[in-house]
Every structure is written in structure tokens, then in C-alpha cells.
Amino acid sequence: MSTKAWNASRLSGPDPSTPWSLKKPLQHGSRPPKGKRLTVCPPTRPKQTIRISASHASQQLDQAKAACLAVTIRDLEEATAVMRSWEHSLVTPQCIAPRYSIIMFMITAVKRLRESKMLTLSWFNQALMMVSKSGEEMRNLRTAMWILANLIPREVLPLTGDLLPSLQQQEPPMLKQ
């Protein structure tokens, strides 16, 4: 044990935690002694560049586009449901055989997009063959597909198949010929 006692009011001996440079009083005009500074830094790894392959980046882009397409399809479903209720409130049943309107074709196409995520030219040709007896329904089908092609953002349009990108580049179809 040490013979020197520590007192809270004054020190009876040197403080062991005081650095050596502060233990000796400095003379007027002199500089503190230059000692070797020991800076202990933990060893660090060199910075590494994170590399992302082109296929991984394109895969992430495709996933983002697919998510955007899913949101667009959901929004189109909601919009066509509103348009359908609006159309039914305005139109009274006048004939026995109901005809497909532009809105009905849009609803059918959006349902197909939701189920299979694709609208192909072969599907469009089959639909045209089914309504080939009615010139009005053919125009309605073309108009509905053209409207859909222009409602879906261009970035995700190629994900919908080959029909809508080809229709988007065309002129708007005439409603009455």
C-alpha cells in the first residue's frame, strides 16, 4: 500500500493519470517537448467497390417494371368499374342482344391483363373474328385497345405483349366512319 493518502481537498502526491508533459511545469517562453505521438488506429480494410452485374441490374429493373404494371392494371380495373357503373346509369336496355361497348372491351382486356399479364395479337384477332359481324363492335374493340395502349406507361408497355405497343404507335381510330 502507498504511504501517501489522497485527500479530496488537495493532492498529497502526484496524480498517476496526469500525462508526463503536464507534470513538469513549463518555463516562460518554452515549448512543450515533442514526443512521439502514438495514435493507435484499428486496422481498416481497403475500401471495396460493390459490383452489381448487368443481369442483376436488369433483373431489378424488370421487377420494378412488373410492379409498376401491376399497379397500373389495378388502377385500370378501378377506373373501368367506375366507367361501367356510369355507363349503365346512362344507357337503358333498348335491344335484346347487348353489344359490347368500348368500356366493356376495356374491362375484358384489363381482366385478361390481370390474369395472364399479356395481350397478344392472336387474342386480338380472335376477338375481332367474334365481333366481325358488327362493324360498330369492331370499331369499339379497336378503340378500346388503342385507349389501353395509351393509358399504360411506355416503360411497361412491352411487358403486356405484342398488341398494345403496336397499337400505341398508330393513329387514334375513328369512332364513327
Curated annotation (Swiss-Prot):
Biased composition annotated in UniProt, kind: Polar residues: 1-10
Sequence segments annotated as region (Disordered): 1-37
InterPro entries: Paramyxovir_NSC (IPR003875)
Domain of life of the native organism: Viruses
Family designation: Belongs to the morbillivirus protein C family.
Name the record gives this protein: Protein C
Species whose genome carries this gene: Rinderpest virus (strain Kabete O) (RDV)
Lineage: Viruses, Riboviria, Orthornavirae, Negarnaviricota, Haploviricotina
